[in-house]
């Protein structure tokens, strides 16, 4: 049966992370006639939140992300080209039966949601991150984050939105970029940047970025 492995993946994810699911939502994943908005509300919401503003930093905030980027990443998960642990643990099974139309609809749904952000907690750390974000670290070969992601972290037609993303998730992705060229095949620029940043610098940038509110 086509939906049994998917239901198993959902059940395992629920046990491991506290995400909840239902029999009906797992069935919907194998049905190409189900609209992406329905999948977003009944399936994706279990981990990412109904509005794409997840409360668990294991799962990224999707609200306000560029539609093109969400489409690209969902297709990378579906084709198993994205090899980071979160990819194969959670997204491979969930995305494998998605149609192109459903991916488009999911991306459009989350792209139009209002993004959130974390409240500032550590001014010293966040200010250090803000300086790197705005100016880079020329002596270490690190360009300003604004060059690609914009002054407010909103991204562009080539680079994703990072403003308001969970700090822990950002750190995790930096670690992925540092670890292997294969895990995130579309992140050539970030691989160079990540290798030139120290752990404390990554933590500072992540802390600042997580507090950038929507503009």
Where do the language-model regions lie?
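Bacterial N-terminal signal peptides that target proteins for export
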Residues: 1-8
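C-terminal motif of bacterial Sec signal peptides marking the signal peptidase cleavage site
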Residues: 15-18
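Electrostatic cytochrome c docking/interface patches
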Residues: 20-40, 53-58, 112-138
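Post-signal-peptide N-terminal segment of Sec-exported extracytoplasmic proteins
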Residues: 33-68, 75, 79
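Sequence context surrounding c-type heme c attachment/ligation sites in exported
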Residues: 37-41, 45, 134-146, 155-157, ...
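The canonical Cys-X-X-Cys-His
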Residues: 44-50, 106, 142-152, 205
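Axial heme c-ligation environment in periplasmic c-type cytochrome domains
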Residues: 55-61, 77-121, 156-161, 180-212
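Extracellular/lumenal glycan-associated surfaces
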Residues: 65-68, 73, 160, 164-166
């Amino acid at each position: 049966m086509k939906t049994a492995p998917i239901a198993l993946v959902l059940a395992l994810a629920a046990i491991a992370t506290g995400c909840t699911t239902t029999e009906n939502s797992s069935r919907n994943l194998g049905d190409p006639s189900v609209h992406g908005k329905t999948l977003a509300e009944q399936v994706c919401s279990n981990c990412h939140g109904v509005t794409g503003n997840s409360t668990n930093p294991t799962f990224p905030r999707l609200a306000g992300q560029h539609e093109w980027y969400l489409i690209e990443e969902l297709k990378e998960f579906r084709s198993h080209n994205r090899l980071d642990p979160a990819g194969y643990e959670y997204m491979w099974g969930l995305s494998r039966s998605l149609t192109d139309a459903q991916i488009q609809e999911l991306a459009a749904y989350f792209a139009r949601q209002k993004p959130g952000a974390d409240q500032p907690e550590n001014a010293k750390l966040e200010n250090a991150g803000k300086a790197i974000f705005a100016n880079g670290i020329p002596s270490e070969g690190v360009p300003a984050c604004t060059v690609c992601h914009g002054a407010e972290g909103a991204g562009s037609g080539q680079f994703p939105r990072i403003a308001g993303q969970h700090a822990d998730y950002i750190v995790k992705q930096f670690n992925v970029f540092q670890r292997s060229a294969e895990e995130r095949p579309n992140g050539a620029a970030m691989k160079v940047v990540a290798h030139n940043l120290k752990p404390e610098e990554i933590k500072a940038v992540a802390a600042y970025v997580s507090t950038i509110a929507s503009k």
